């Protein structure tokens, strides 16, 4: 049989959940309303920053008032929502290129290219187009497509970097260096590379980041970086606010705040979790374990570090899932692992229906799956065929 009974049940549940998420996400106007008025989604923040950079005012991308005015240029009307641009100035070059298009074509280009890169990385990890289709079904992928966020870029860059690490370490380092566009996703990369003795990749990553910073300073000027630094301080203050919608933060900090814990105590717990993630990553990458498990562990631990992560960032968990599948193709499938992967995706999907930090549960589930696999070694596998 192509599928066991358990696999068929998993597929049926997955399809049903997928349909529910589609109805939840797309059951209303998207980008363009029935009256022809454009809607603002997260991508407008990137477009507006690129519009300002292209007009010769890159530092204005980090000025809330000027950035909000640029929203109007893209939408053709004022928007009640303001989507900031909290990314390093070297991201402005890509944003400016996108802003040469109108808002909707730029959005379509951004989503199409990021989804293609994500699927390409997934296929490279799993080793088959069918595996890439599975990766496309992750609920976090839908969120990124719907609002034009950058979670697919994060997953693609991390995936490309890890899949190339053993074969082409310098190219891998370039991909991992590019991940610095979102520092909270890249923080554990140096830990893993140092622990694993991946010195060529580490050097390539460091040189990539240095080149991006130098080029940005030369083109956009020091004032743009100063404006970026000032905005980071404002974001830090926002996280500590007592009236923050903490359900959107898919982190331990967000979960504890949602349960009523004061900001300072929740942040202390988050720092402890980050320290544990750093230690776990170092241990995993120092051990002579299968590379696929090391990569899966890094992807899962990555989302335990920062207090500032949202549902679209959970696309990074698909890198962990892809490497777990890659490992299982060689070592054999394990029923606990399969249930863990399904449970993690259900937890991510639950965010769309509840606006609560169930993404933390998904991260912890996959972390447990990785640690268990490392402890067990190579158990007898189930008779479930690999994706082909």
What residue ranges belong to the model's regions?
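Membrane-embedded alpha-helical segments of transport systems
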Residues: 181-184, 211-215, 338-340
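Membrane-interface alpha helices of multi-pass inner-membrane proteins
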Residues: 170-194, 298-305, 344-350
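General helical secondary-structure elements
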Residues: 5, 20, 178, 335, ...
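Primarily membrane-embedded glycan-assembly and transfer machineries that use lipid-linked glycans
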Residues: 1-171, 193-330, 378-388
């Amino acid at each position: 049989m192509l599928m066991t009974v358990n696999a068929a049940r998993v597929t049926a549940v997955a399809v049903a959940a997928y349909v529910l998420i589609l109805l939840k996400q797309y059951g209303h106007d998207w980008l363009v309303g029935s009256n022809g008025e454009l809607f603002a989604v997260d991508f407008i923040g990137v477009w507006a920053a690129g519009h300002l950079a292209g007009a010769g005012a890159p530092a204005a991308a980090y000025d809330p008032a000027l950035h909000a005015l640029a929203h109007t240029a893209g939408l053709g009307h004022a928007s009640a929502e303001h989507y900031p641009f909290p990314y390093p100035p070297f991201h402005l070059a890509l944003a400016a290129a996108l802003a040469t298009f109108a808002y909707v074509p730029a959005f379509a280009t951004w989503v199409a290219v990021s989804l293609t890169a994500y699927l390409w990385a997934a296929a490279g990890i799993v080793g088959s187009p069918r595996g890439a289709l599975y990766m496309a079904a992750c609920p976090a992928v839908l969120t990124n497509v719907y609002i034009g966020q950058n979670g697919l870029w994060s997953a693609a860059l991390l995936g490309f970097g890890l899949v190339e690490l053993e074969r082409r370490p310098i190219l891998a380092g370039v991909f991992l260096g590019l991940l610095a566009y979102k520092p909270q996703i890249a923080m554990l990369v140096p830990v893993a590379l140092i622990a694993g003795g991946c010195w060529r990749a580490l050097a390539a990553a460091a040189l990539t980041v240095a080149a991006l910073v130098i080029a940005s300073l030369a083109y956009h000027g020091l004032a743009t970086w100063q404006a970026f630094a000032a905005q980071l301080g404002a974001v830090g203050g926002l996280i500590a606010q007592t009236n923050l919608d903490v359900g959107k933060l898919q982190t331990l900090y967000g979960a504890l705040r949602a349960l009523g814990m004061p900001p300072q105590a929740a942040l202390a717990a988050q720092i402890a979790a980050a320290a544990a993630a750093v230690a776990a990553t170092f241990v995993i990458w120092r051990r002579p374990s299968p590379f696929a498990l090391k990569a899966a562990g890094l992807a899962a631990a990555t989302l335990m570090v920062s207090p500032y992560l949202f549902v679209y960032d959970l696309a990074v968990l698909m890198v962990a899932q892809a490497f777990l599948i890659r490992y299982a193709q060689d070592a054999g499938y394990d029923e606990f692992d399969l249930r863990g992967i399904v449970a993690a995706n259900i937890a991510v999907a639950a965010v769309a229906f509840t606006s609560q930090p169930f993404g933390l549960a998904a991260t912890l589930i996959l972390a447990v799956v990785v640690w268990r696999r490392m402890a067990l070694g190579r158990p007898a596998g189930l008779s479930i065929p690999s994706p082909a």
